[in-house]
Every structure is written in C-alpha cells, then in structure tokens.
C-alpha cells in the first residue's frame, strides 16, 4: 500500500510540474519566472527558460502545448555559460559580444547563443543541439521579433560557471 501511495504521489507531482512549464512566448504568459523565450524562425516551436530558485528550466515545444523537452539546469552540474568578445577596430573600443548558455544532458548539449552586434548588424539568437560535443544535430536561428530576453545581460547569466568542455559547436565571428 505504501508503494502505491508513493507511486501515485510521484505521478501527481510530475503531472503538476509538467503542467506548470510549457513553452510560451512572453506576450502570451504572465508567468513571473520566465526569463527567456523565443520562437524558432520558420517554425511553430518555442523555447522558454524559467528560473526556479537556483535552477533554470529549459522548455521546448509547440506554444502552450505539453513540452517535448524539459531540462532542469543546475549550475556546475549541467548548466554552464561561455562568452567571447571580438574587437571591431585596433583600439578595441568597439566590440561584438557572443554569449552562450548550455544545458547538458547525458551526451547532448542544448546551446542558446546570443550575438550582440551593437548596431553593426542586427543582433541574433540561435539554438544548437549537439551530440557528444561535436556532432551538430540541430542549428536554427530564433525569430528576433519574438525574443524575450531577461537572461543574457543580467547578473543571473554573469554568475553562471564557465563551460570547460569542448567548444566545437560554438559559432563565433572570429
């Protein structure tokens, strides 16, 4: 009987958890925990990232539907960042910045990239999924008009630990 109750509670808690975190664009939700959302260009799929205590939750799927992928990111375990600055001139007074946030699950890496081009050209965001840190399975641009970003230029991002793994899937302008 005790096992049945525990099993029932586990199902109930996972159902409640999956109901709470669905892929949404910012304009369509009032969830205060949403820190990033965007729609994949030429697709109906949406990426949402929620902040829950010290964790970031990556959610992928059709907007408002049950998530196809949920990853609970914990710093120093499976949640990391990387960044790069590229000087635009010899004086190094103008730079492009590239910011990357990584969610790692087993041998897969889910990478969201933000390229801040400071008006030189339009800023851009991409989603890349890699297997074994080298084989790129998915690499799509995010629709800039749908992006809600309260993540990349915040203390939350700055406090994330750096990724020390292989960086073959980072696309940089160097």
Predicted regions and their residues:
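Sec-dependent N-terminal signal peptides
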Residues: 4-13
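Extracellular/luminal recognition modules and glycoprotein regions
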Residues: 19-82, 91-95, 99, 106-107, ...
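Bacterial Sec-dependent signal peptides at the C-terminal "C-region" and cleavage site
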Residues: 12-20
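Short, low-complexity, Pro/Ser/Thr/Gly-rich segments in the mature regions of secreted, periplasmic
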Residues: 159-174
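Blade-loop segments of beta-propeller domains
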Residues: 85-87
